[in-house]
């Protein structure tokens, strides 16, 4: 009897398809109702933006700040759903990490694909301050996903994120190990039933959906499509073949640790050269 009741509750709680982009520098969520015609919506994510302010932002910066024992009051990390946090995730973590880089974890996603490091070993921040706390790449990813779960659940108490149809994007160039580690991070965050979708394909589907009835006309004369996904920490390339049977993925580029972060540094170096000063990068 209890099993039937629990199943009924689960069915009534499942209302959305939720897409999660666990990014190298920024993470995001979008949702679409299952039972009605509607447009895709971006999901704002509640997060701390300073010691004294919590706000809703369109993305969650993928930064984890691990403060020292007496660095700041505990209330500086409180969130509406948890008043006992001893770390910060998101905008405040990014801002605080710029002040003390040795206490902030960034680019955890890249470490999931790093074969010369153990993703389950607590090695981040890579250049941590002396006696500073460290976490693994999997744990950092778990905290980002858990934060997005908690923010969603706070806004949708009757429709918990874990009970929705979940799609989690990964780079097309992620190997099976990196994909399994992403699934493990989601499992640890309480998101056990997720479908992985390659990021360039997700971008292409976004273009394709409003043209689903006319795409052959839109792509008349085109034989192949190259999707270039330049992210915060990686570049991802996917080639799609157009033939009589439809669309077929035919190639994926190598995993390139090159992205917006590198572009920022290149611009900063150019500014240094032109200004004739050394910047604190």
Model regions and ranges:
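Phosphate-binding loop and its immediate beta->loop->alpha context
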Residues: 41-188, 265-281
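Gly/Thr-rich phosphate-binding beta-strand-loop-beta motif of the actin/hexokinase/Hsp70
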Residues: 6-40, 212-249
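Alpha-helix capping and helix-loop boundary segments enriched in small/acidic/polar residues
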Residues: 173, 177, 225-226, 254-262
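Short acidic loop-to-helix transition motifs that present clustered carboxylates
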Residues: 175, 198-205
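Secondary-structure transition/capping motifs at alpha-helix termini
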Residues: 36-37, 155-158, 188-195, 214-216, ...
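Phosphate/ATP-binding catalytic cores across multiple sugar-kinase/actin-like superfamilies
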Residues: 3-4, 13, 143-159, 206-216
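Active-site nucleophile and cofactor-binding loops and adjacent substrate-binding regions
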Residues: 52-55, 195-201, 258
